[in-house]
């Protein structure tokens, strides 16, 4: 049996402000840093050790991993960093407040933009300074692979090659792996692992800074999965994520 630990980054500044973040490189809040520290302490307390860790090229995920590994006294852990683990690209929605957008377009439309499997928001124009082709960290990525928007289906297509080529072989080789990434890149991976349908994936919400453990068989099929930590706290955090795209009530 293998174990894989997945963790969404701690609360970011735009999580706090309830904005569509996507590939925008915002940092953690103090709460987010504390979540990462507590996650690392919990992993250490539960006896977890890692041979390899993986994360995206976005600082909120990288810093979450750093802080968690530091709390485990394991900063020496080798880390693989890939743009393929980035958050889903939210196109022209990036930077907009989710509740204000819901008030303008309706809760249902925002839910479609946030959670529909095959519907992407309006793309960024090619000349928009927010387009990843203007960001030096993506300079070596072929231009036709850089998204101007994505749906979850696109995110799955981006994440799975990295899973198949890097993460899964490491697990099969007996490496103990931690992945610190983002809500939607982890949803994409979980959809693959658990074979979740396109319709059912809409209801999956991943809280910030909570270690999620997958026990896998020899074929990397899930035996079971569970969050570490307080169950009531995790349920409340999931509910908060689900409510982010709703208009505020007067």
UniProtKB/Swiss-Prot annotation:
GO biological process: gluconeogenesis; glycolytic process
Keyword Transit peptide: no
Pathway: Carbohydrate degradation; glycolysis; pyruvate from D-glyceraldehyde 3-phosphate: step 3/5
Site (Transition state stabilizer): 182
Domain of life: Bacteria
Keywords: Gluconeogenesis, Glycolysis, Isomerase
Active site: 9, 87
Catalytic reaction list: (2R)-2-phosphoglycerate = (2R)-3-phosphoglycerate
EC nos: 5.4.2.11
GO MF terms held by the record: phosphoglycerate mutase activity
Function: Catalyzes the interconversion of 2-phosphoglycerate and 3-phosphoglycerate.
PANTHER family (UniProt xref): PHOSPHOGLYCERATE MUTASE (PTHR11931)
Subunit organization: Homodimer.
Name of the molecule in the record: 2,3-bisphosphoglycerate-dependent phosphoglycerate mutase
Organism for this UniProt entry: Bordetella petrii (strain ATCC BAA-461 / DSM 12804 / CCUG 43448)
Gene name for this UniProt entry: gpmA
């Amino acid at each position: 049996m293998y174990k894989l630990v997945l963790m969404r980054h701690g609360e970011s500044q735009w999580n706090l402000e309830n904005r569509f973040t996507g590939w925008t490189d915002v940092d953690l809040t103090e709460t987010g840093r504390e979540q990462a520290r507590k996650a690392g302490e919990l992993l250490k307390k539960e006896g977890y050790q890692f041979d390899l860790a993986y994360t995206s090229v976005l600082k909120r995920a990288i810093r979450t991993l750093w802080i968690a590994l530091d709390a485990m006294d394991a900063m020496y852990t080798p880390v693989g960093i890939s743009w393929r683990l980035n958050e889903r690209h939210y196109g022209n929605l990036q930077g907009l407040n989710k509740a204000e957008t819901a008030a303008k377009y309706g809760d249902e439309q925002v839910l479609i933009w946030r959670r529909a499997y095959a519907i992407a928001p309006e793309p960024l124009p090619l000349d928009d300074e927010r387009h990843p082709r203007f960001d030096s960290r993506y300079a070596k990525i072929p231009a036709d692979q850089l998204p101007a928007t994505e749906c979850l289906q696109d995110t799955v297509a981006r994440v799975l090659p990295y899973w198949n080529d890097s993460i899964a072989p490491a697990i099969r080789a007996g490496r103990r792996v931690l992945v610190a990434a983002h809500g939607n890149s982890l949803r994409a991976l979980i959809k693959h692992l658990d074979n979740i349908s396109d319709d059912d994936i809409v209801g999956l919400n991943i809280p910030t800074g909570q270690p999620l453990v997958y026990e896998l068989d020899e074929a990397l099929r899930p035996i079971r999965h569970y969050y570490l930590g307080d169950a009531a706290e995790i349920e409340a955090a999931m509910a908060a994520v689900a409510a982010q795209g709703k208009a505020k009530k007067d």
